[in-house]
């Protein structure tokens, strides 16, 4: 029945799928704690986790759509495969990463919270997970809001949310680099770093150049 399909898409799927993806983020947060130190780490870990999930799910959906087209004899732009490809690959390739990044942000903010704020460190990931489930449910249920519900949710909610998360990740990265630029010269003055290292480590461009140089450099023989 249509009501059962709607319930599955808007309640069961968001809860199960976001919980599964959050479990992967939680494992890294717990067992690779030194590498999970802030908001950017939360965005990256959650984004990669959800991208792998979306890749697998898209293959399943496209495979099922292709099977339907084989049975019905449909082909071209009117086929189920073409429609599925347009909605999942063209219109919403970042849907799953966007949902789970909200969970990752919760873990990221928890990572920078003081250890004495135990309640906050628990509540923030849970809040992120609830937001991820809510956005996922809204997205899955958008088609039930009328003929233009999908496009309304896409333009009013999904696009601004994606832009906000992108801005937050860039801002957080720049903040970390400014902190390095301010603090590392003290270590250089103490002799723990060379004079050039603080500038190199506080610039993404300089880091990239250093990696390229190390990749192509060969010692004299």
Where are these regions (language model features)?
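Hydrophobic alpha-helical segments at protein termini of multi-pass membrane proteins
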Residues: 1-221
């Amino acid at each position: 029945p249509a009501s059962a399909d709607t319930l599955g898409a808007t309640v069961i799927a968001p809860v199960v799928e976001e919980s599964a993806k959050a479990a992967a983020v939680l494992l890294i947060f717990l067992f690779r704690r030194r590498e999970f130190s802030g908001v950017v780490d939360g965005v990256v870990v959650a984004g990669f986790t959800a991208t792998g999930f979306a890749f697998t799910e898209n293959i399943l959906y496209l495979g099922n759509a292709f099977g339907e087209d084989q049975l019905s004899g449909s082909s071209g732009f009117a086929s189920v495969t073409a429609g599925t490809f347009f909605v999942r690959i063209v219109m919403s390739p970042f849907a799953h990463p966007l949902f789970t990044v909200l969970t990752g942000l919760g873990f990221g903010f928890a990572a920078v919270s003081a250890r004495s704020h135990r309640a906050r460190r628990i509540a923030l990931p849970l809040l992120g997970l609830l937001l991820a489930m809510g956005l996922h449910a809204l997205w899955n249920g958008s088609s039930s809001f009328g003929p233009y519900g999908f496009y309304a949710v896409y333009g009013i909610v999904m696009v601004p949310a994606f832009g906000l998360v992108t801005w937050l990740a860039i801002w957080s990265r720049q903040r970390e680099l400014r902190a390095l630029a301010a603090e590392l010269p003290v270590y250089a003055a103490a002799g723990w770093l060379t004079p050039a290292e603080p500038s190199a480590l506080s610039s993404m461009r300089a880091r990239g150049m250093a990696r390229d140089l190390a990749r192509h450099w060969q010692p004299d023989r």
